[in-house]
């Protein structure tokens, strides 16, 4: 009798994706982040669902409903902090996942990579709208500042902003629609993640060497299921440690003050995972230029496959490119730090230099270095 997992229509899909999937024998722990992102998404959807049962998307009651969740709902504080810090874990995994793709040349799978970029935009949009929901000071002013950026779009800008706001300022209509979008987007993200996997399984996984692994494949189960479970346990360990010992470590104290349109906080800044993009936005004095740079800071990822000039796929055997990659990582850490600092000397000039370096590295230095390495190897 044939095994049910190989005959049943639904089980066949699961089997070919997670059990009998041929995987390269040499993929390292950097390949764990895909499954970790899946776990993060599940955690976020589940905790978000339970939060939505008690949350009210009204400007008058939103803040107090979050307080009510933390004080009166059974384990409400746990659900709320798992959701808030789960977002941080989500972005840590996202950045590492993208970094892995850049280092090992996974971007050569064009469809998979482009859907990944789309997913990154969707997750960032979801996180931004989620940050607005508690209706604290930073929620309100963050929403005001970021949505206002759209007014830089010529001709239709101001109409577009009012259309998004549902009025002449960030108010009840804005909060309600942000809640609706924040609820629906994770399910769209889940569907996109399914398509992301579908395209990945068309080609099979890349591996650290960047060479074809067709000659040496192993089944996904038990080898990589066990490996993924270890990653998941470590993720849960870090997340629960964060939630139970210092749940507000990554948050902003200003968000514990109810939103007040008449009082602007001294330093308006987004959550830590947006600070690098925020620093790039602030480094350009012109409003439209800043908005374009902000979008390009993520959209530049979509151009990377076309800037690949090396004859090797991975950076594993390319020391000069490795140096530039780690300079890029250091540059992003610098931008994240600058994004959280006030707009004053010397932070302004550091931010501007780091922003220039970010685009210069990706668009100019890395492709040229790859060509140089080809010549050094007489390829």
From Swiss-Prot:
It comes from the Eukaryota. SUPFAM superfamilies: a domain/subunit of cytochrome bc1 complex (Ubiquinol-cytochrome c reductase) (SSF81648), Transmembrane di-heme cytochromes (SSF81342). Pfam families: Cytochrom_B_C, Cytochrome_B. A ubiquinone binds at residue 201. Binds 2 heme b groups non-covalently. One of its GO terms (cellular component) is mitochondrial inner membrane. GO terms for molecular function: metal ion binding; ubiquinol-cytochrome-c reductase activity. This is Cytochrome b. It comes from Soriculus nigrescens (Himalayan shrew). The gene is MT-CYB.
